[in-house]
Amino acid sequence: MIPRRHHFKPAPQPTVQVLQPPDEDAPSLTITMLGAGQEVGRSCCVIEHRGKKIVCDAGLHPAQPGIGALPFIDELDWSTVDAMLITHFHVDHAAALPYIMEKTNFKDGNGKVYMTHATKAIYGLTMMDTVRLNDQNPDTSGRLYDEADVQSSWQSTIAVDYHQDIVIAGGLRFTPYHAGHVLGASMFLIEIAGLKILYTGDYSREEDRHLVMAEIPPVKPDVMICESTFGVHTLPDRKEKEEQFTTLVANIVRRGGRCLMPIPSFGNGQELALLLDEYWNDHPELQNIPVYFASSLFQRGMRVYKTYVHTMNANIRSRFARRDNPFDFRFVKWLKDPQKLRENKGPCVIMSSPQFMSFGLSRDLLEEWAPDSKNGVIVTGYSIEGTMARTLLSEPDHIESLKGGNVPRRLTVKEISFGAHVDYAQNSKFIQEIGAQHVVLVHGEASQMGRLRAALRDTYAAKGQEINIHTPKNCEPLTLTFRQERMVKAIGSLAATRPEHGTSVKGLLVSKDFSYTLLSPADLHDFTGLSTSTIIQKQGVAISVDWAVVRWYLEGMYGEVEEGVEEEGKAAFIIMNGVQVVQISPTAVELRWKSSSSNDMIADSALALLLGIDGSPATAKLTASPNKHACNHSNSHSHTDLYPHTYPGDKSAKDVASNPEFERLRMFLEAHFGHVEGPNLRPPLPPGADGDGNDDKDKDGDDWLTMDVKLDNQTARIDLISMRVESESAELQKRVETVLEMALTTVKSLSQTFLGGGLDVDMVKVEPNESDS
């Protein structure tokens, strides 16, 4: 440590230095739809923020064959995905998962796939069923994966619980919430570096016979990515739908017809089975007419439904508690052999997959029953554009047969949606309750989505509110920018006492996963497991000039240099309170400093300055005159001191008042205000004397230097020690303070600017003379 030759009082060091974040840390969010952008089907949403990448859902388009059914997977480097979140098991949300996990470079990265326990259980069954159905399709190009791919993807997925907070390294976390819709369906509240995104998937805000409705997360998200399946349509309430449905079914079988209901193996099929079983129980006249579900997958899935009763609504849970299993149907039976239908020509009700009737048993039964007007088909779910289910709704005279040719269509076609999607009223209310700053509409046809956006804007405008609604197309990135505050949490000994407002708190700033913690260096190991080390750096430089010349250059660059001796007695300078320049020999100096971002910059600049001394014209001028040269020998002779060493006690009042920094400050103020007086210095009052108007003293009686700015008969006095401004005119005081701030930035030396101090002023005590007595 170098002994100081005089007292130097530096300004307080900055407590925390916060660097600008890199580009990838910019507070913007990018949402790219690889599917379900202004369409229904192949849901796949990519969310990117602060270097993190999340994919929500990976479905197939039911109306497209083969590769064309996949999302636009070539638009993404799947090895960079941090997590995939699957909302539910439906084909248009999960059926592309085996292909992505097994046939892309997703497996080369570190990403994991997450879904709820019930979704994972049913996912394995439905994907195996998808493989089986694809194998039945004569078009082999539709076979995207096999059973081995499905099994491998199923084993790699991670099952999570509702309301479970899942934390992934790097500031990424998510929580699943109930979405209604189907068993196991969830919406995900995703948080990336403090930014919250709610991805709803398909959801329902109406409790049915076995499912709870979608819940509102307790935390308000910044962005809501929301389905828009039904657009502005308003659906009848549940009781009305159930009455219409059961009446339609009863009318078909009472006229001797056969009723076909194409359903997914899981989802509204179980809901309809509960409804029909209850209706048949209440109508004995129908109990001789069989009701079938023609799906082995449906039968196997009932075991899953019984396993996850705890996720269903209170009615189902209470019935199970009474040992009354609602899924033990009395009248709805499993049709193991479809040939039985061809042998028995009487009326019946059959629920069969697949839902969209593109192929499979539901398509076979449609073609077989279509010519008979006594028969009927009831479409109970949402029909995607391009599927046979959507074609039937237009009631064509003929339908295309998979065997070739056309089949006359005489059976009745009705639609009653039990698809467990929200209608406009439910969707609009839910969006308002969530209260997100941005709403992104997905999973809806372009026309429906456009009408929904207009209706939502009108709803908010009527309340005098604004909302940002976006409807991105597939592969068109949507970028949203957010203004986020960075909060620093003090822990350990720093948090022992609450600091007063305006006080400085100094400590180590620890950043992890986009969160910031301030703690004392002594607490670092206890709270983080990290240890600290101090790096002392040294750099030798050869010089050929006198030690005084070195000081002259350092003073010219940094404004103030402290002179002293280091521990071994060698002469040294201290630059800006951080870097030592030690004279290790007459022809060499050594820079020494504790490594830090600020000290490294100072050392770099000092090194560049010292290396340029020999080639500088100023050096030649300084050493050209006799006795003003570098002395590299031991002969004793006089030298002209390039820097007159003056200390506080050596400076007279006249010396201080004529400080060139004050002169530059006065010139700066005169350019703005015109009339400036000073610097002024008056001796203190003698003991016992009365006041004479001289108030330029501190509490110890030492004189203060002042400067007076006069404008329009008003005066503002500047204390040149503290740089405070006082005036009876508040307006003039404010103007002078503003100009003074600019002036100090201009006239201060580099060291004063860096350390945050004022002008270099030493306190001067002036003895009173007789004229002042």
Swiss-Prot record:
Q: Which residues bind Zn(2+) 2?
A: D92, H93, D202, H443
Q: Where in the cell is it found?
A: Nucleus
Q: Where is the composition biased (Polar residues)?
A: 624-637
Q: Which GO terms describe its molecular function?
A: 5'-3' RNA exonuclease activity; metal ion binding; RNA binding; RNA endonuclease activity
Q: Note down the stretches annotated as region Disordered.
A: 1-22, 624-656, 677-702
> Matching InterPro entries, A to Z?
Beta_Casp, CPSF73-100_C, MBL, Metallo-B-lactamas, RibonucZ/Hydroxyglut_hydro, RMMBL
Q: Which GO terms describe its biological process?
A: mRNA 3'-end processing by stem-loop binding and cleavage
Pfam short name (any one) = CPSF73-100_C
Primary location class: nucleus
Q: Which UniProt keywords apply?
A: Endonuclease, Hydrolase, Metal-binding, mRNA processing, Nuclease, Nucleus, Zinc
Q: What top-level branch of life does the organism fall under?
A: Eukaryota
The entry's active site is H421 (proton donor)
Gene Ontology cellular-component terms listed: mRNA cleavage and polyadenylation specificity factor complex
Entry EC number(s) = 3.1.27.-
Name the positions where Zn(2+) 1 binds: H88, H90, H181, D202
Give the protein's biological function.
Component of the cleavage factor I (CF I) involved in pre-mRNA 3'-end processing.
For this chain, the family text in UniProt reads: Belongs to the metallo-beta-lactamase superfamily. RNA-metabolizing metallo-beta-lactamase-like family. CPSF2/YSH1 subfamily.
Name recorded for this polypeptide: Endoribonuclease YSH1
The organism encoding this protein is Cryptococcus neoformans var. neoformans serotype D (strain JEC21 / ATCC MYA-565) (Filobasidiella neoformans)
Gene assigned in the entry? YSH1
